[in-house]
Every structure is written in C-alpha cells, then in structure tokens.
A protein has these predicted regions:
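Phosphate- and other anionic-substrate recognition elements at nucleic-acid/protein interfaces
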Residues: 1-192
C-alpha cells in the first residue's frame, strides 16, 4: 500500500566485521535479514528465507582481501537493501593481540574509509556493551549470546545450519543482530 510518498523506511544495519566470517543484519521495520561471508561450501547460498551466505572471493594479498570484503558490504547495502541507513559496526575487542590485530584494524579501516567516501555515517558499539545489551552480562560467551538471540527472535540457527555448536557463521549472525539492536537502542536513548 502506497501513500504516494517516496520516503523509505530507515534500515538499521549491524555489522560484525571480521576477516574470516563477517556478518550483516538488516532490520527494516520488524523484518530481519542476515548475510555473511564464509569459507565453507556447505554454508554458501540461501540457508532460509532471510539468511544468505556467500563464499569469500579469491584474493592475492591482504589489501585485495580487505577490498573484497568491503565490496561485499556495499553489495548488501546497495544491491540488496537500497535505502536510508543507520549503520552500526562492532568496535575492536581489547583482547585482540599480535599480528592479526593489525590486519583486523586495516580491514575495518578500509570499510570505514569507504563508508565515509560514500557519505554513509556509522557508529561503533563496544563489544562488552553489545554483550551486556543482549544478556545483561558484559562478558557473555557465544552460547549465552545465542540463547538470548533464540529466545528473542525465535530463529533457531543451530537447526538451520544443522549443527550442535555455536561457531561461525552462527555466532557472527547473532553478533550482527545485537550490534544493530543495541547500537540503535543506545543511539535513540542518547538523543532524549
């Protein structure tokens, strides 16, 4: 039903950004869609009506890899969910260490730079704030996060992915949901 208005519903985007299994949650009204990248062929494609995975593209060097991952984010935003966005990205975990920390930072830096270039503002949400918003505990583990997600959304990802454990991409999908939800709730409560 259209009232002739060209205004589009604001889409709340939650991005759990990583090198191996990034995930995006798109909230539009009461509709949820989830996207993720994976290295596992069995998780490539549509897992359900609102959950879709895609295999990582081949890459030649780290910068090429980071560019491909950010290309995927823009594919989800522009090709699958064009519109008015409020974007939230999970912040860095202070537990990250070693050489991998630099690649994580470079990877996310490229995404943030590209979002800025396209005049798409974003906010970061601290991991402990996400966990506390989901479970009431800032140090919640993956299983606690999953149980909160299942209770809240009624989406049984273990059943959909035919697995007993909360690994990738399940934990990434859960995190992307709470990045969007907690980020949005915190940003609206800070405006009052």
């Amino acid at each position: 039903m259209s009232n002739g208005s060209t205004t589009k519903t604001k889409k709340i985007i939650g991005i759990d950004y990583s090198l191996t299994s990034p995930a995006i949650c798109v909230m539009s009204g009461d509709k949820l869609n989830f996207y993720y990248l994976t290295n596992k062929k069995k998780y490539d494609g549509k897992m359900s009506d609102n959950i879709e995975g895609q295999l990582h593209d081949d890459w030649d060097n780290p910068m090429h890899r980071f560019g491909l991952i950010s290309d995927w984010v823009f594919y989800v935003l522009y090709d699958l969910h064009e519109g008015n966005y409020e974007i939230f990205i999970e912040g860095y975990s202070y537990g990250s260490k070693g050489q991998g920390l630099f690649q994580i930072a470079e990877n996310c830096g490229i995404l943030k730079y590209r979002l800025e270039q396209d005049v798409l503002s974003y906010k970061t949400v601290v991991p402990s704030v996400i966990k506390k918003g989901a479970t009431g505990k800032g140090n919640a583990d993956k299983d606690m996060m999953y149980e909160a997600f299942l209770k809240e959304t009624k989406i049984d990802l273990k059943k959909i992915f035919d697995t007993e454990k909360v690994g990738n991409p399940i934990s990434d999908i859960v995190d992307s949901y709470y990045v969007a939800k907690v980020g949005y709730e915190n940003s609206t409560s800070n405006k009052s």
